[in-house]
Amino acid sequence: MNLKKIRYKGDVEDTKELFDVYKVQQIIKSHEEILKEHITFREKLLADSVRLTPIISPRIYKIIETVKKDFGLKQKIEFFSLMENSYNAFAFKQKNLISVVFTSALLENFDDAEIKFVLGHELGHIIYDHNKLLLLYNPDKQSTTFLPILAEKKFLTWRKKAEISCDRVGLAACKKYEFAVQSLLKITYGLTEKNLNFNLPELMKQLDDLAKSEYMAELSTSSHPLLPVRLKAIELFSNSQLFKKSGKLTAEELHAKTDELLSLTKFYPRTKVKEMMMKLVAAGGISMIAADKEINLEEIKSLVKILADVFTDDPESEIIYDKDKALKQLETSEKYLKQHGTDIDRYYTLHFLTLISLSDGKFTKTEKEVLMNTAESIGLSKEDAMDVVWKTLQQNGITIDVRLNEIAQNVQEHYADYLKE
């Protein structure tokens, strides 16, 4: 099977964007240089785990050789067992040596076909060079990655798509959908067929119940898609012509259906009220930015950042460039929020708009008027609106120093002329 052809197109596209648009190769290269100064993880494995050679574990060696032959892999693979009671596995590559690590619990409780699925999945990350992008994770956990917000959004979206690609490689290794299902059920839920009668439509109902919850937005930062999504994606692939010639789905149909499935995991408002809050912030933010007759980049960046932080993976799609359409959206969302929103919804909407107004280092009379008009339109009294504005100012201050910007601009202009000489 051509592993390059079965890779999920969404994974390929997002990887390309991360490198071409966000230039992540510089961060990856820097991280690789830092890691060279530390003891390698392989050295730790040699000290803390057992390497399963053909003599020590002929069973595992046979599985590895079978999968290598099926995939046409020529690189050497070494296999480690790490003593741990949970089911887990990972792989990494140093030069031309691939190291695969399974926990002892997984090896003891998974049959050969299930191990093939997990092995194929982990090798998929190596084959598709995913592990380089994983160097973008920030190990100190203060932030998810080393990336700015929009790049991080793209990275987290890509991460889930990468898992879809590798699940396909896992299926290619174990050959049957049932084996892939059994493996993922054990890893995720700790359940076997003894206690679980697998029924994908029933599991998808669980996802349907969760889909309308705002908790789904929190799950958007997780590295893996929810299990029902993964199982459905594998089922789609197993019925495609990419997996078998007799498959019902063409490559294009598979891609479209997988895209639709993955959209369930995106970061986007799950309730109508929150969606209207987002649309009001998008349209109201632009209206306020334009009110001073001066389009300030700091205010625009603040608007986009708030949309990305609070509401959506794709903030640009919420910006309306047609003035009449933006005004109509503003009126519609204001009316909806007044009728259906809570005081908390109205408070935070005005809070976000206030943050945008402060982001250029000024708070003008015109901006205040726009905020007060918006407050009235969504059902906040003038007193409550001023309370929101004042508390936002107290909590966040004015982060842009106008005088500092003037100095920086003077220096920039001076040295621009100097460099021309």
Model-derived regions, located:
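Catalytic Zn2+-binding segment of zinc metalloproteases
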Residues: 108, 113, 122-139
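Acidic/histidine metal-binding catalytic segments
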Residues: 78, 132-137, 176-186, 319, ...
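Short, conserved phosphate-binding/catalytic loop or strand-edge motifs used
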Residues: 97-98, 140-149
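Small-residue-enriched hydrophobic alpha-helices in membranes
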Residues: 151, 155, 185-220, 233-421
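Short helix/loop segments within enzyme catalytic domains
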Residues: 48, 55-59, 67, 71-73, ...
